[in-house]
């Protein structure tokens, strides 16, 4: 930068109002995304950031984001994440928790609350709007998986 002064007024910090988010971004069934930070809104070159809303008792379709890394910050609600070749792995996150999604990981976001929207902030490692929706067999419905052992009875067993 020797010999040249930078125009910090036009090339410095940007504030994007929550009232000016851009919903013209690739969508996944069951989820609404809106861009806050991208090249068009802030001049960003390597990052994408925005909001994600999953309605009460809803889940997204199974998808991945190619080479992109994603970070989800849970603002409110309860997130349930499923991932893997058959969505065989499950974890949950609540307000204040961060979720990291590596490249090419098939996953599904689920709102674990039946009566409240799941609100999150999403950050991606690139501007490329990659959403690859997948049609894969699911290991099982987590709502139908029961813990059965000598202490927990099988709810489908017939009483004698």
Q: How does the language model describe each region?
A:
Residues 32-38, 50-66, 103:
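Conserved short histidine dyad/triad with adjacent acidic residue
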Residues 41-45, 55-59, 76-80, 129:
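Short, charged/polar surface micro-motifs in flexible loops or helix N-caps
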Residues 55-57, 83, 93-113, 123-125:
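Conserved metal-binding segment of the jelly-roll/cupin
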């Amino acid at each position: 930068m020797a010999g040249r002064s930078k125009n910090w007024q036009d090339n410095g910090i940007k504030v994007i109002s929550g009232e000016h988010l851009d919903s013209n971004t690739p969508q996944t069934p069951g989820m609404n995304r809106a861009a806050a930070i991208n090249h068009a809104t802030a001049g960003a070159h390597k990052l994408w950031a925005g909001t994600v809303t999953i309605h009460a008792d809803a889940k997204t379709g199974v998808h991945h984001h190619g080479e992109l890394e994603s970070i989800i910050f849970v603002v409110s609600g309860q997130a349930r994440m499923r991932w893997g070749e058959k969505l065989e792995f499950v974890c949950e996150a609540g307000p204040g928790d961060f979720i990291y999604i590596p490249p090419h990981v098939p996953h599904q976001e689920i709102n674990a609350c039946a009566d409240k929207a799941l609100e999150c902030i999403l950050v991606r490692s690139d501007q490329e709007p990659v959403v690859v929706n997948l049609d894969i067999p699911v290991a099982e419905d987590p709502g139908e998986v029961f813990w059965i052992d000598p202490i927990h009875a099988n709810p489908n067993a017939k009483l004698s």
